């Protein structure tokens, strides 16, 4: 995929992410607690669900972003229990890249290790919000690996948003829309994402404190 095509595809993904962020309709809350809310609605991208997580994280937007950013130097693999490794396959620009992420087994090994190959665009907005915008792609240097089930991320990512009057807090809104592939009971998938997203926020809070506290 050349730069022009990648830019066009990634901009379309980023626009979808903005639509998800702005559209308040159709969301059903499936998990709440510790200041974090997880909701879902049916995906229009694949026969599954789009999940939204919302929570306030103690830390500046820059600190939170350093922990979650899908860029070189990210701290993500050091704290996120759902990420074994994150590697940049190819950087097209400072904010546009191809990545490969591997995840461990989960739900008492009912979900075996996965890998995901994505095109990622980072956007910065005038109000200081930083967003990551990702979707699955194929890349010649990353054919399927027999050690992993290849999963597919449909438009997903996060928004790190400053809180007016609260410089040391960040509103983090996340969107997950993942086809885990393999032969998984839908009940396993439906229970996994809300629980793992709630855990993501709890672990992120600890990570910001550990790395920047």
From Swiss-Prot:
Any one of the GO BP annotations: cholesterol import
Signal peptide: none
Keyword line: Lipid transport, Lipid-binding, Transport
Pfam families given in the database record: START
Gene Ontology MF, one: cholesterol transfer activity
Record Gene3D superfamilies: 3.30.530.20
Source superkingdom: Eukaryota
Transport in keyword set: yes
Ranges for domain START: 1-213
PANTHER family xrefs: PROTEIN CBG07384 (PTHR46374), STAR-RELATED LIPID TRANSFER PROTEIN 5 (PTHR46374:SF3)
Function description: May be involved in the intracellular transport of sterols or other lipids. May bind cholesterol or other sterols.
Protein name as annotated: StAR-related lipid transfer protein 5
Source organism: Bos taurus
Lineage of origin: Eukaryota, Metazoa, Chordata, Craniata, Vertebrata
């Amino acid at each position: 995929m050349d730069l022009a095509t990648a830019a066009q595809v990634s901009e379309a993904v980023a626009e979808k992410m903005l639509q998800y962020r702005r559209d308040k309709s159709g969301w059903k809350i499936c998990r709440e607690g510790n200041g974090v809310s997880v909701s879902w609605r049916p995906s229009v991208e694949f026969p599954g669900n789009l999940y939204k997580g919302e929570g306030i994280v103690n830390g500046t937007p820059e600190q939170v972003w350093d922990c979650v950013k899908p860029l070189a130097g990210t701290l993500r693999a050091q704290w996120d229990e759902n990420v074994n490794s994150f590697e940049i396959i190819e950087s097209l620009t400072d904010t546009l890249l191809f990545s490969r992420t591997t995840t461990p087994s989960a739900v008492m090994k009912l979900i075996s290790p996965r890998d995901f190959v994505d095109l990622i665009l980072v956007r910065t907005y005038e109000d200081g919000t930083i967003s990551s915008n990702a979707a699955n792609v194929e890349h010649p240097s990353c054919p399927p690996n027999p050690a992993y089930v290849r999963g597919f991320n449909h438009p997903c990512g996060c928004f790190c948003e400053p809180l007016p009057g609260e410089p040391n807090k960040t509103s983090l809104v996340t969107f997950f829309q993942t086809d885990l592939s393999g032969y998984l009971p839908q009940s396993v998938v439906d229970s996994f994402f809300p629980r793992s997203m709630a855990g993501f926020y709890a672990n992120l809070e600890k990570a910001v404190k550990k790395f920047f506290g």
